[in-house]
Amino acid sequence: MSSFSVVIPCYHDEASLTTLLGQLRSLPGTSSQGVLGVQGILEIIVVDGADDQKCREVCGQYDARWVPCEPCRGQQLLAGTALARGEALWFLHADARLPPDPILAMERALEQNAVGGYFRFRFDAPRAWPALLLEPAIALRCRVGVPYGDQGLFMTRRAYMDAGGHSPWPLFEEVALVRGLRRLGRFVPLHEPLFIDPRRWHRDGWWRRTWVNRNLALAFARGAKPDRLADRYRSKTTI
């Protein structure tokens, strides 16, 4: 049984973070101090790219460690991982919403000799027809390509280190990591969903948001620099 360090990059998203931390602290067996002994959540590390006092206060309310950092998701994840003490690592975005018992699902995968895995992508919203089309398409993309960081990537600490860790980039920071993990062993999809906030799809439009995301992924695959892609992302979408 593993102890998990949860690492959460955040940037001006205190409302969503409050909900997520509340869910994490309400999981079966989780202590308010984050010390569980042989299994469960050992610690929660929030890496704040905005260096915001509000974020720090939210972390204090839920006994999460607050770490300021430059606003670059890859750098934030690296900073959080450098402080993590758990035998396993679980990376969550601040706007993620959890299934009932994610720790048990991850434990089962690791006990079956997986090096890590990811949760099924599902929008946290009433079932609109665009979501019903996009969710299976995303599942297929994950199997033939790379699951992204909003799907709750988890892995053993050793596998993370052996795979090379996150890239220090603002976008696509998990791509090399996931590919490295798959070379090491089984990186498995879980049946359990992680619920994704659809607010950005609502603001930008379902198909416009999807089109921009796919174009960025194609540009990255062709060798475009992540820093330049991040600038393009911010110019075309509502962050």
Task: Give the location of each predicted region.
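A conserved acidic beta->alpha catalytic loop
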Residues: 48-56, 96-97
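Conserved donor NDP-sugar-binding/catalytic core segment of glycosyltransferases
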Residues: 100-129
